[in-house]
Amino acid sequence: MASAVSERLFSLELLVDWVCLEAGLPQPPVVAEEEQKEEGEGASPPRPSRSLCPAVAFRLLDFPTLLIYPPAGPAAPAQESRPGLVSFRRGKSCLFRLQPATLHRLLLRTPLYTLLLQLPPGHPTPAPQLLGACSISLAAAVHKVLGFAAPGSSQSHRGSFPLCNRDGERIGDIALGYRLSDLGSSLLGHLERPVASPGGGVEGMEVQKSVEVSPQTWQENQQLQQPDSEPSPGDADKPLVDVKISRAGKDLKGRAFHSKADSDYTDSMENGKTNSDMCSKGSSERSVSPPNQEGTEVELETNIICPPPLYYTHLTQEKTPPKQGKITIEPQINASEEWDDGTFLKENVNPPTHTNPPEHTNSATGESCSVLINPASVQDTGASNQTTDHPPTEQNRINTIRQLPLLNALLVELSLLYNQPMANPTHIHPHLAWLYRTEDKKSPESSVKSTCKSESKKDKLSVGENEKSVSLQYKKNQTENLKKGKYFEKKGGAPQKRVSRGKLLYGLTNTLKLRLKQTNPDMLVEYEKKEQYKKMQTQMLGAKLRIPSSKVKILSFAELYQKPHELPKDKCLESDASFAENSNTSKQISVVVDDPSTTTETKLNCATEKTVDCDENRSNNGFLGEILSPANSVVSERFICTNTLEGKVFGRKSIQSPGVFQQVAVVDRTVVDKEIDDKQVKITGDDILTVDINEKNPSTSSCSESISELKYSDDFTSPCSSEDTSRILRACDSSPGTENPKNSQHTSTSSETRLSIRKNSSAKSSILSPPFSAGSPVLSHKRFPVSKTQDKSLEEASSSDFSSSQWTEEKENQRDQNSMHNSKVIKQDHDISAKPKTRTGCKSSEKSQSPRTSQVSSYLPSNLSELELNVLDCSTLDHFEEDCDDLGSLNISKQCKDICELVINKLPGYTV
């Protein structure tokens, strides 16, 4: 016997097969000693009862009593297969911890007490009556268990023991079995799941756990080992009631662990001696007519609680999980996936033969990834994706999908994503129906309108058909800008071809229109006239833009300038000169400059700018060809034909544009664009952004800006905003002062250099300054008080409609081309303060305000643009002298550089 110093865990399993009473229910005397052997349940002495309500109690050492009830339960009359025979087939197992030597010593002296009790019915339950008792010695079992060196050994015994009453008279027999096992020093190696450990017992901790064991092994053993006189093995296993074994006594330091379980006897159990004399009759009857097997089977299934298999030498049988309905997709060989029709996975509850897991639908790709595992073959995923269209299954599918709102929503989204209408409207869950609208309700214009409010507003004021005539390139770029709602940097070179999805119209917004009605009705009339003019221009341009690329050079310039009805003679001269310059040398440019010098300042500016552009184009014939190609050529759509590709801006149609807006803006812009390359463009207080021109692609950005501006800049970017309407009117009438030819020539030379620079930088995307917030009334507020010189008003007016839109293009171009013709052009359409080398261009561009800020720019006085201030700082003293008149008009910009300086209260409906 190997005794360990440390405590070890032991298991005692008990199973009661049956109890047989010889002479029926005896008349039990009331004895006080009964209460000593049972857990204290004090009550008045019970009266004898003729109905048998038995219970078997086990006392091991000082641990708590284990009670085992018949299948009917406690205090319930027992079902007797024959008089005096009660079948239990229930048991309990208990765990306790003791030192092996202590356990051996105690079990040698103290047996296992077995008590047969009578539990009379009543509430509260009366004290049980002792019917009989027997003592079972565990000395042999403990000796054998502890005799093995290795833990895990067990010793079991099974037999029939006589029951004696208090007088020592034999009243019957009890058939039971027990097994004592040594589980070693730890329980962790035996349990598969954690055990709750509530405190219990005198000095120990008690742990109750649920365990499972297969009843078949116990039944098999009983069939092999149970004597014929014992009940049939089918009733062997019975669920056992919880048992608490508390250890008391100082010598017993064990901890009792209780578990509900059926005892499973896998080890051979010794056949107990049966008292043939006492139970011969009962045994014979039992052998002839065993208890009802079926009733026992049901009881076993409902009452069995199995302990972990580690307690036994044989593993328990794994329970096969119940077969569950599977959702599968039945592949159809000839069918193809029909997500377009809104068909969904077919959900079938298949018989247990299909054990494949439920299929999953990949909502992201809209494809079913589940595979149906058929007995014969595994279907391909493509086949499994196929769906069936049988009417009954279709209805079931619909019902199933409607019960899964999220899956339904995903499927609906997929169908919408691929423009595939839903086959059945019922697929949409009622709670999600509000998320979806039929596509018919959504017109393509709605998406476009949502992209930009200004676009929708413009649609009301201007005809969309005219817009279509505008070159596709501009429309595509504008569409792109509108969707983003901001002027963004263009990614280089020629404008990318995009599918035009709607009519992009720019002009007065409803808000501005209403404001003009209240503040300046005359200005509103002027705007409407300009819009009509624009429509005519766009129609004419549309026809011209369709001309082949070979003719684009000539037609884009010659035709635009040759149109007499809208172009003054001076303008025609300028346009002709600029065209000639394009094809000819720069000498012609200087000549052209000389010619317009006689004309008004605006006309001169236009001519000079055009000549500069022509010179640049001429110097870079290859570039010019590229620019003029249909894809790359940026013909000024409505008012100004500006070729911004490769950073070149050709302000030709500025001449065509209305007298007020035509000349100055385009020409100046082109020059300024080229000069802006190396310089940082500082946005005015309104523009807010400081951009490095090198980083930005002036050509591309300017192109994008001009595109967006062409339709939209009229109202906002132009100084003719609602507040500046008086200014615009003046601009139309005002005659500009002559511009020095030096500037134009200088810009032309610099422009050529800039062109090469621009080509390099054209690959880069230019970052456009963000548009001014509509809520910044600073610019608009100060426009009214600002008195501008006629030259400025004229420049601003010209830039407002045409140049403003083109200026956005040219601004970007001008950033690279700052050195070329910074003078008036930058002022007019650029709120961004480009540091142009020519002062006049800068001033005009500043006045016109960058089309990027077109929404706010309409409210901004051209004078206020910080661009002008920056330009003034950067411009040479000569430029300042030359542009004294323009500078005089810039006083307002100096007055208000910060939004904090604005008096916003004067603007109705605006708050900061």
From Swiss-Prot:
Q: Where is the composition biased (Basic and acidic residues)?
A: 254-263, 452-468
Annotated region Disordered: the residues are 31-50, 209-239, 254-296, 335-366, 443-469, 730-859
Low complexity compositional bias: what residue ranges? 347-362, 796-807
Cellular compartments annotated: Cytoplasm, Cytoskeleton; Cytoplasm, Cytoskeleton, Spindle pole; Cytoplasm, Cytoskeleton, Microtubule organizing center, Centrosome; Midbody
What's an example GO cellular component term for this entry? centrosome
User: A Gene Ontology biological process annotation?
Assistant: cell division
**Alphabetical list of InterPro entries matching this protein:** MAP10, MAP10_C-term
- Residue ranges under compositional bias (Polar residues)? 211-229, 266-295, 735-768, 841-859
Predominant subcellular localization, coarse grouping: cytoplasm
GO terms of molecular function: microtubule binding
Q: Recite the UniProt keywords alphabetically.
A: Cell cycle, Cell division, Cytoplasm, Cytoskeleton
- Summary of subunit composition and partner proteins: Interacts (via middle region) with microtubules.
Q: What does this protein do?
A: Microtubule-associated protein (MAP) that plays a role in the regulation of cell division; promotes microtubule stability and participates in the organization of the spindle midzone and normal progress of cytokinesis.
Protein name in UniProt: Microtubule-associated protein 10
Q: Which organism is it from?
A: Bos taurus (Bovine)
Encoding gene per record: MAP10
